[in-house]
């Protein structure tokens, strides 16, 4: 059971995202391989055939129309990019953990991190950055019924972090730009030197990272 007294859980429920709906939205793989296994254990052809089926399913899922939280369904090109990037280093459930992803804007991360959750949930705390910092900030909640079901992701961001994350996604991610650039841009954002999308682009394109701090 979810702790309904937690304001974060209460907010999700008010928007229609309940544990019962997460269970109904969960899709079980028919490949017969646990998602805790490395990607190399999967047939690439069969995996992507199933991923296409899963995305088609979500694109026609009526339950999603009853949930008042922004969501997105990942496209196959993005999944292929992640597959090729992490083929030798990641478990499948760490790569395909956000085919269906919800995004909740919240005032702070304390309530999110304080949630008491059933074993089907896993929290990834990136409120102070990733292990290898690329500028992103947030807390991700992954729901997975068992190791043969595709995970569902719920992203929690403050409005301030969400704004910067969106600029990162638009101008930095998937463009072969080193992680350190995102981390440096974040520093400028926190120091007040980046206050708008225009500022972000000017700092990114202005060669400022060739200078000594």
Residue ranges, per PLM feature:
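An acidic, glycine-/histidine-flanked metal-binding catalytic module
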Residues: 1-52, 153-213
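Sparse, context-dependent recognition of short Cys/His-centered cofactor- or disulfide-binding micro-motifs
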Residues: 7-10, 64, 84-91, 124-128, ...
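Long beta-strand-rich cores associated with HINT superfamily self-processing modules
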Residues: 91-203, 210
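Short low-complexity stretches enriched in small and charged residues
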Residues: 20-23, 54-64, 105-114, 198-199
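Surface-exposed, low-hydrophobicity interaction/linker segments
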Residues: 28-87
């Amino acid at each position: 059971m979810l702790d309904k007294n937690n304001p974060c859980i209460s907010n999700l429920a008010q928007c229609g995202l309940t544990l019962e709906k997460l269970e109904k939205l969960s899709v079980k793989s028919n490949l017969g391989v646990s998602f805790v296994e490395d990607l190399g254990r999967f047939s690439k052809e069969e995996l992507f055939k199933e991923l296409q089926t899963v995305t088609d399913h979500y694109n026609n899922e009526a339950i999603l129309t009853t949930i008042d939280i922004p969501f997105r369904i990942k496209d196959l090109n993005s999944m292929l990019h992640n597959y090729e990037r992490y083929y030798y280093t990641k478990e499948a459930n760490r790569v395909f953990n956000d085919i269906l992803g919800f995004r909740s804007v919240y005032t702070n991360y304390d309530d999110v991190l304080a949630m008491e959750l059933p074993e089907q949930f896993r929290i990834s705390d990136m409120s102070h950055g990733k292990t290898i910092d690329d500028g992103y900030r947030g807390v991700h909640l992954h729901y997975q019924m068992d190791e043969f079901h595709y995970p569902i992701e719920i992203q929690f961001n403050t409005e301030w972090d969400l704004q910067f994350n969106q600029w990162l996604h638009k101008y930095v991610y998937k463009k072969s730009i080193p992680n350190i650039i995102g981390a440096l841009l974040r520093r400028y954002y926190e120091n007040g030197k980046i206050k708008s999308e225009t500022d972000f682009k000017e700092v990114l394109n202005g060669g400022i990272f060739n200078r000594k701090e």
